[in-house]
Amino acid sequence: MTESEFLKQAEATLDQIEATLEELANTSDLDVECTRSGNVLEIEFIDNGTKIIVNSQAPMQELWVAAKSGGFHFKAQGEQWMNTRDATELFAALSQMVSQQGGVEVVLRDAG
């Protein structure tokens, strides 16, 4: 994958995560605020002040996630982002992290 292809896929994924969480904040009990600065998406849980940070790392061609449960690296495999350690898909992993930190069961899905 070229750097421009990576950046395009990473940007689309960050956009999708942000849009999905904003929709969930409006339609469920999830109290979350998303802030985007370039390649960094900060997800703040209002009730407890914890955060999840998702950012793209172009040199490594990975998305990195920092959450209360730890740090995780995801590499593109086709249209999906897979955890480099245990092959968990990004949206499945984020669903679990957001549910844990937000105290509300949510499911995030990759629209791609």
UniProtKB/Swiss-Prot annotation:
State the GO CC annotations. Answer: cytoplasm
Keywords in UniProt for this one? Iron, Metal-binding
- The identity of this protein, by name, is Iron-sulfur cluster assembly protein CyaY
The domain of life is Bacteria
Function according to Swiss-Prot or TrEMBL: Involved in iron-sulfur (Fe-S) cluster assembly. May act as a regulator of Fe-S biogenesis.
InterPro entries in the cross-refs: CyaY, Frataxin/CyaY, Frataxin/CyaY_sf, Frataxin_CS
Which GO molecular function entries does the Swiss-Prot or TrEMBL record give? ferric iron binding
Task: Report if keyword rRNA-binding is assigned.
Answer: no
The processes (GO biological process) annotated in the record are: iron-sulfur cluster assembly
Q: Is Ribosomal protein tagged as a keyword?
A: no
Q: Transmembrane ranges?
A: none
Identify the SUPFAM superfamilies for this entry: Frataxin/Nqo15-like (SSF55387)
Species of origin reads Herminiimonas arsenicoxydans
Gene behind the chain: cyaY
Q: What is the lineage of its organism?
A: Bacteria, Pseudomonadati, Pseudomonadota, Betaproteobacteria, Burkholderiales
The family this protein is said to belong to: Belongs to the frataxin family.
